[in-house]
Amino acid sequence: MADLIFVPIKDQIKDATYSCYDGACGTGGMLTVAQDRLLELAEETGKQVSIHLFGQEVQPETYAICKADMLLKGDGKQAEHISYGSTLSMDGNATRQFDFMLSNPPYGKTWKVDAEKMGGKKDILDSRFNAYLEDGTQLAMIPRVSDGQLLFLLNNAAKMKTDTPLGSRIAEVHNGSSLFTGDAGSGESNARRYLIESDLVEAVIALPEKMFYNTGIGTYIWVLSNKKEERRKGKIQLIDATAMKSPLRKNMGEKNCELTLELRDEIMRIFMEMEESSVSRVFDNREFGYWSITVERPLRLRVYPDRMIPADTFKKAEELEQVQKAIRSVPAGTPTDDWTVFSNATKLKAAALKKIRPFITEKDPMAQPIEGEPDTDLRDTEIIPFTYEGGIDAFMKNEVMPYAPDAWVDQKKTQIGYELSFTKYFYQPVQLRSMEEIVSDLKKLESETDGMLAEILGGVEQ
C-alpha cells in the first residue's frame, strides 16, 4: 500500500516535509511502514525529506501501544499527533490536510454509537459525509449503520490537499461491499458517486482471499488521487490480483497466504503500466454509473355498478343512500370500462368516489387507462447503464415500449447510482471437460471395477 501512494510520484518528491495520516491506525504499523518507504525512495532520488505521522485510534489498548511506539522512535514528537477516540464522531484532525493517507478501517462493523453522537443518522451534517457536485447536486453519503467503512474513505477524501503540486494520495483497504452495496441514491452509492464523479479514483485492486489474520473474505485496495496524471484523468483501472499469492507454510488465523516481494512488484508493474490485460482493465468513469428508473403503467378499471357497498363505508346511512342513488342515476350506455367517464357521470365528490371505488371496480387490462394514475402492481424498476446509447429515452423506446406501449417513466423517482463489479469484468467460466476426457475416464472406471459385481453377488449366494 505504501508503494501505491509513493512510487507513482517518487520522481516528484522534493526536499520537503510531508505528512502521512491513518484514521484507523491501530498500533501504527501502516504509518511506520509508510515512513520507512518514503525515506527509502527519497534516498534513492537524492532528496532530503522528513515526514510527520498522524493517526487516530478508538481502541484504548491499541492506541496506547501506538502512542508508546511513537514515543520510543526518533525524538518522540510523532506521538503528539496520535489521537484517541472515534475518527467518525470525534475527528482529532478536523482542520488538517495531509499529503498521504492509508488505512485499513473496520468493515462490516456497526457505527450506530457514532451516528447517535453525531445527532442521528438522518440529521448528520458533517461536511465530510455530505458533498456538493460540480452541478450543485447535494449528496448525502451516510451509509447504513451496520457498516461504516466507507465513512473512513470519505474522511480521508475530505482531508486531501488541493493547493500543492502533488495534491494528496490515498490507499485504503475495504471489503467487497464498498464496491456495490447500496441501491441508487443510497448513502453507499452516493459515496461512490462522489468519489468517481470528482475523478478521485485511480484504481481498485482485488487482493487474494485470506490475506488478513481476522477475516478470510476478499479485500480491495482503493487508490485515490486528486492530482491524477494526464493518462488517468477520467478513468479507473481495475486490477485482479486475486490469483497473485504465495501460500504460507502455516496458517496464521484466517491468513493462509501472502504477497511476496516479487508479487508486490508485479502488481505495481501492472498499476504503473496501466495497460489492458487479463488482470487489468481500464474504463472511463461513466462505465460504473447507471440510472435507476421507475417505469409506470396506467391503472385500468372496469366498473360493476350493481355491486354492494358495505354499510360501514360511510358514517351515516343517508350518505350511503345518496351514493347508491347517484350510481343508479348514471345514464344508460355510460361505458363501464372507463372509470374516468363513469365517475364523472355520478357527479359524486372525490372523497366519496375514493371510498366506493374498491367495492365497485376491478382491474381489467382491457379497460381504458386512468390518466395520471399508475397501477402499482405493474410498477417496475429498470437499471440503465450510463453507457447505454441514447440513454433513458432510447432504452424505453427499444426495451420497454415494444412490450408495454402505455408505459412511462416517473421522472421524480429517477436515481443515479454507481457500483464497481469485478465479477462482471474478470469472470472466468469453469472450463467444461471435453467429451473425449469423459469417455476416457468412464472406460478407465469400467476396467477398474471389472469383476467386482460378480464377487459381490458370489458372496451373497454363498
Question: Predicted regions span which residues?
Answer:
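Conserved S-adenosyl-L-methionine
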Residues: 1-103, 107-123, 175-177, 183-191, ...
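A conserved structural/catalytic subdomain of Rossmann-like adenosyl-cofactor enzymes
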Residues: 95, 99-455
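Soluble, cytosolic/nucleoplasmic coiled-coil alpha-helices used as oligomeric scaffolds and tethers
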Residues: 455, 459-462
